[in-house]
Amino acid sequence: MGRGKIEIKRIDNATSRQVTFSKRRSGLFKKARELSILCDAEVGLLVFSSTSRLYDFASSSMKSIIERYNETKEDPHQTMNASSEAKLWQQEAASLRQQLHNLQEYHRQLLGQQLSGLDVEDLQNLESKLEMSLKNIRLRKDNVMMDQIQELSRKVVTT
């Protein structure tokens, strides 16, 4: 059975407040350490008590974490190093090339070219898509023609 929820408000009794601070601080530091280990994250934690005492935790060097924080704060787009960024752009370019290739192949299939690699199911799917496209084209053509007829009828009536 879980613990009941407590109301989050300032603890008036100084001794109780200090005990709670100490327990919660150690729990917070434990969670920070676990996050660092489990997720291979660089974690820095600073806590000042009500008596201005400093408590800190750093998974590596607090100085390097603070420097990294300041650099990121100044230029948030500089969080990746050059090789990571280059790798990211290479992956993006490869993905876009593959997308372009797939679209070109699909376009050729719609034009009736390069159908030799398709099996019966693929050909049936392509046929269905073409029939749907043809249906949409005919519907659009009918709508345009109806609009033109109505426009001509209005012109005849007004003259």
UniProtKB/Swiss-Prot annotation:
Q: Which keywords has UniProt assigned to this entry?
A: DNA-binding, Nucleus, Transcription, Transcription regulation
Indicate yes or no for the key word Phosphoprotein. no
Disulfide pattern: none
Q: Which GO terms describe its cellular component?
A: nucleus
- A matching Pfam family: K-box
On whether Transcription regulation is a keyword of this UniProt record, the answer is yes
Q: Boundaries of each K-box domain copy? A: 86-159
> Which SUPFAM superfamilies does its entry note?
SRF-like
Give this protein's Gene Ontology molecular function annotations: DNA-binding transcription factor activity, RNA polymerase II-specific; protein dimerization activity; RNA polymerase II cis-regulatory region sequence-specific DNA binding
Expression sites by tissue? Expressed in seedling roots and developing seeds.
* SMART domains attached to this UniProt entry: MADS (SM00432)
Would you kindly state one Gene Ontology biological process term found in this protein's UniProt entry?
Answer: positive regulation of transcription by RNA polymerase II
Domain MADS-box intervals: 1-61
Localisation per UniProt entry: Nucleus
Record-linked InterPro entries: MADS-box/MEF2_TF, MEF2-like_N, TF_Kbox, TF_MADSbox, TF_MADSbox_sf
Q: What does this protein do?
A: Probable transcription factor.
Under which name does UniProt file this protein?
Answer: MADS-box transcription factor 23
